[in-house]
Structures are given as structure tokens and as C-alpha cells.
Amino acid sequence: MANVRRHMQVDHRANLETAALAVGESLALAWAHFHLLRGLDNGRLQHPAIVTRFDLLYDRLWRAAFDAFFAKVGTLLDNKKGSDSLLRFLVLARRYASLEVKNVLPEIEVELSNQDAPLAKLKRWRHEVVAHKPTAHDAVGFHTQNRMTLTEIESALEQLDDYFNQISWNMLGLHSEHRSAFAGIVCQAELLFATTALGLATEPE
């Protein structure tokens, strides 16, 4: 692959690097919002009394992190022309790649278009619950068909990250680590819950 990258036209590489930077930033922020959701959920499980005491605050924090996460997922999966999405990055890769590199792209394209895959569920959540909220939306039916745990969401995000790095490595020789950049949010959220619980426990009657 090194030979393929060496002979890429300068302007093509520049276009790919610009797209990779934009997609990478969205991936990192998606991970940041996911880690916040995970931290809030862990805090809820470890200290349920805190959620009972501050129920409205917890609900709003969760909703804000939820909406922010799916906004970034929407950016990553947007198929509109000119968007800074993983799909746009894939289009550029197909346009500029040699035949050898193009052989690794169809599998990614198939998975991204698979309507039964976890990624399709993420896309539907963003479209029907966070972004557009169609008037004919059936909340009960939608939640039954598209229910996802945080672990399933995490797996889908890992898949997006993996697809990005497959393209980036084959086209640019670059591998990026997005997940760990904001991983400390989980521990910090847990610590916040624990500290608050301790403070409540020592409150005078």
C-alpha cells in the first residue's frame, strides 16, 4: 500500500486529508458524548439515590448528551453531497484509489447500507427521535424495533471507527485513535456521583 500512497496526486491527498480531519473530529466528539452517557449511566447504577434526588437535572443531562451524540452520528452517516461524513470520505477514497485499494471498499459500503445492522439503528434514532421527529412517528413501535443498549451503541461506534481507519490507513497511511481521547469522562462522572452521594450522606438532618 505504501507504493499506492506515494503515487497519489498532491491535490487528491490534500482533499483526503481534509476529509479525514473532519470525520476524525466528529468521531472523537461522538466518543466524548458516548463516554458521558456511559458515565451518567454508571453513576445512576452505582448511586440511584442521587438520580432520585436530582431527577430533573439527571434527565436533562442525559437528554443533552443523547442529542449531542446522535447529532454527531448524523454527521458521520450523512449521505448529502458536500457533507463531512464517513460516506463522503468513502466516496473520495473510491474516486482516488487504485484498483488494489478499491478492493477493500465494497465490504464497508455494504455494511453502511445494511438496514438490519446496528449502524442502521443509529441512523434511524437520529432521524426519527433526535433530528426530524416525523408526525407519524410511532414511539412505542419504534422503541420496540430499534431498542439498543449502551454496549450495542458502543459496538456500532467502534465499527464506524474501524471503517474510518481502514480507509485512512489504505489511502493515507494514517491510523487514528479517537475512543481514548475523552475516555476519562466515564471515571470523572462516576467520581462526581460518588462525591455527591458522600456529601448527601454527611448532610446534617
Kindly give the residue locations of the regions a language model identified.
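Histidine-centered, metal-coordinating catalytic motifs and their short helical/loop contexts
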Residues: 112-140
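Amphipathic alpha-helical interface segments
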Residues: 1-118, 143-205
